[in-house]
Amino acid sequence: MNFVDVEPTLENYWRAIILFGRNTASYKFALAKSLIDVSLDSKSDLITLDDLALPYAMHLCEHLKHSPKQSTSNNSKFIQACIDFNQGAITETQLIDTTTKEGFKYVLDAFHVVNTKAVQERFYDVIDEEFFIDERKFNKGIRLTDNLFKLFYVFDHSAENLNQETESRWNLVEKAWELNLNKNLVAVEFDQHTKQLFSHDSRHRRVGITSSRGALNG
């Protein structure tokens, strides 16, 4: 079954963003996980960039510890700030300041953009509202919509399941970058003895990708 034939539910709309959005950097994944965090914890639908900055940056900081390549660009002030924070070179306050200034420049505009036109039309014809509204110009933040709260606060287990799927997709993109492969060309194999998923790098060496299992299901 083609993905566009799947029922256009909020869960599948989220999956479309995670699966088919652009992956020139991992900011989309960090933002997605941050949105899950704030939708569960916030008492207001208005989230300032200052409040969103720390959970957003910390997700990226955590991934940088095991996957240094988080962007196809080599000159990101935001990523450098996360690296500096991990190394103890800057404070949490400095990390938040840099994240607020540099970390949201493109990701908020790009988050809901799905590159596959058929998927985009399939969901936008049925789901009449995105997961957040950009209010940086007037309120220095974003406003969470009912769709986000329905998805992660009302529906049972959605936060847990989609959080893991987002994490797994992030791991898979990292692995593709590590192998210097297009993320759609990662050949997945299964070792019957160890019960682990693996692929091969450009030198035909085995590389484990079991951490990406959630993104490969289905």
Go through the PLM ranges and name each one.
Residues 1-217:
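Mixed-charge, low-complexity interaction segments
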